Amino acid sequence: DTIEARVLKRPQIYQPANASYHDKQPSAQASSQPAARPLDDTKILGTIVHQPIPFRKWAIFCLEKDVHHGEYLNDRFYELSEERRFDIYVDYGDIVELSNKSGIEAFKEAIDDYYLKYVCGKDANGRQLTKPRKTKDLYFFLIIMPDSIKQEHLYTALKNKINTDSPVISQFVSSKTIQKYNDRIYINILRQINAKLGGDLWRLNFGAEISRKTMLVGIDVCHKGKQSIIGFCATYDEHMCKYYTQASPQGQKGQEIISSGVLQEYFKSAFQAFRDHNQGQLPDHIFIYRDGVGDSMRAQVIAHELEQLTKIVQQEYCLDPSKEPALPKHTLIIVNKRVRQRFFQVGANAGISNP
């Protein structure tokens, strides 16, 4: 079958011209004169760091037998920074050494002690030693996972611990990964940390077809084990690189429809994040990608969740009764993994190609 359709222009990847953040300050020329390259130029994806974040205060946690790996990683991060491979400034991190017999609890205690001393300015007994610092002054923790502890258990326990009690970005690396002595691996680790700290790796130029005040929303319900978990993610900047995220358990296992209160609260918070970032303005177009919907529940989910979006939009966009509200357009896209149809573009000579 043949249908009429519109083929949008291929997006371009922005890359700052002559960018250099090595001196810890962004170049004015780099931010004001971005260059763009075609999206299919994949060679640049591994080298671009559009918004570098300087790594100043950070710490490595490892067993005594892995200290030399931590020292090597510390040196290599700094040397890669000096070589200006990707314009991220990396200072030397502290190395916190644990005995080789240490288990998960010992790692937790070491993280607690370091956070208490550096951020809170207290010793292990709670006595104030120095003036407290802000959490944001501590950039991230890097944990070298030893072979002697089951890595899945260590990762889960420490990730939950850090997120709950020590709100600091964390990165986990196995000792085997460091022993590969591959700069490409180390660069990827730095880029992952940069992204976790809020620095954009690359940005897309969407052209005039997409409004600068567009919010992109992803919603999924994951069913695993005894729980069903809601995942919610919404962009709030014009480049669609900054995200508001939330996750919470459903009321019962297998439940696909998200309750009214939860969904409205998520959208309300996402709109507030957009408002805070855009001088009080709200999106004029909302794209929603809804995943995790079975065929049997699709109609109910669409009807229920669109109704909740309409309600919260009416509340958020009609705050001033003296003004006529400019309600946003919204586009709902249901993600279906079981798709057999394929679409091709018909060329001038009746040849077909991917659009």
Model-flagged regions — what are they?
Residues 1-355:
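Long, low-complexity, intrinsically disordered terminal regions
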